[in-house]
From Swiss-Prot:
Keyword field: Nucleotide-binding
GO cellular component: cytosol
Taxonomic classification: Bacteria, Pseudomonadati, Pseudomonadota, Gammaproteobacteria, Pseudomonadales
Protein family: Belongs to the YajQ family.
Superkingdom per UniProt: Bacteria
Alphabetical list of Pfam families matching this protein: DUF520
Record-linked CDD domains: YajQ_like (cd11740)
Any one Gene Ontology molecular-function term assigned to this protein's record: nucleotide binding
Protein name: Nucleotide-binding protein PP_1352
Length: 161
């Protein structure tokens, strides 16, 4: 039976490159030169933004978002927390989300069922497996999911006949 998986994955090398580009851009910006830092933690997939003032944090976050877009990484995967004061400086944490949580998986399954397509969707950990009798039905399911707006970027892989 033909099937495919709906996943939400990040290319970790591209994320690292985007953060490196944001660091270089921060050094080039005259208004932010020497006033802020990006600290990327590879294991946790988080970026700690540090600046003197809160408006500088907002500008740094915008630099990071632009760097992600240039590297073709969807900014929906970036989850930011509220800024907080730490001594004389302000800090803000940004986390890269990966994987489909249960709530999003349920929305995906409900969307497929509401589409009344001849496919079945099953939640398997951090992915959703969609199976059907015909390849065309699966392609319709992919088209349906692409038209909907979800709070995470979705990829379709492991397409099997």
């Amino acid at each position: 039976m033909p099937s495919f998986d709906v996943v939400s994955e990040l290319d970790k090398h591209e994320v690292q490159n985007a953060v490196d580009n944001a660091i270089k851009e921060l050094d080039r910006r005259y208004d932010l030169k020497g006033k802020g830092t990006f600290e990327f933690k590879d294991k946790e997939q988080t970026v700690m933004l540090t600046a003197e003032e809160e408006f500088q944090l907002e500008a740094m976050l915008e630099i990071l978002r632009l760097a992600l877009v240039k590297r073709k990484i969807d900014v929906k995967c970036l989850e930011t927390k509220d800024p907080y004061a730490s001594g004389k400086e302000k800090k803000q944490e940004a986390k890269f989300r990966e994987g489909i949580d249960k709530d999003l998986a349920k929305k995906i399954v409900a969307t497929i069922k509401d589409g009344k397509l001849k496919v079945q969707a099953a939640i398997q950990g951090e992915q959703v497996r969609v199976t059907g009798k015909k390849r065309d039905d699966l392609q319709e399911a992919i088209a349906l999911l692409r038209t909907k707006e979800f709070d995470m970027p979705l990829q379709f892989n492991n397409f099997r006949d």
